[in-house]
């Protein structure tokens, strides 16, 4: 084996016929061993010898097939499309009606005019005016308690100097 010439690449060995020559030599050697072991009755038990050579090409790798998805005629695709609702383009009036319905369900009022953020500032008294009872008793004012200051007076309605 030391006197064998080793090719630089398997492509060069295949082109020059070196691989075929080595394969034929190994087959001849294995046939001679079979004949010699078959004629001699010394070894009653025969053993199989598997010769693997790195210079021989290995078995081809398993092929991977990339399959396409079935068209819309497939049973899986059509059932998935039937269960999913189709997106509908709604008009502005439909969207506003749904919004008002959801708002009424959640907040209890259908119009956004009832919110304190959107009230005009004219309902509120000017900053420097005195505190009146009518402001506390207004129907829109839902104050549970008025905070008291450190000296027992009403804290937020006390005028600063």
Curated annotation (Swiss-Prot):
The modification Phosphoserine is found at residue 125. The keyword Phosphoprotein applies. Keywords: Phosphoprotein. InterPro entries: SUZ (IPR024771), SUZ-C (IPR024642), SZRD1 (IPR039228). Residues 1-17 have a biased composition (Acidic residues). The keyword Thylakoid does not apply. Residues 18-35, 93-104, 116-126 have a biased composition (Basic and acidic residues). It comes from the Eukaryota. Residues 116-160 form the SUZ-C domain. Pfam families: SUZ (PF12752), SUZ-C (PF12901). Residues 70-91 have a biased composition (Polar residues). Residues 42-111 form the SUZ domain. Residues 1-161 are annotated as: Disordered. Belongs to the SZRD1 family. This is SUZ RNA-binding domain-containing. It comes from Danio rerio. The gene is szrd1.
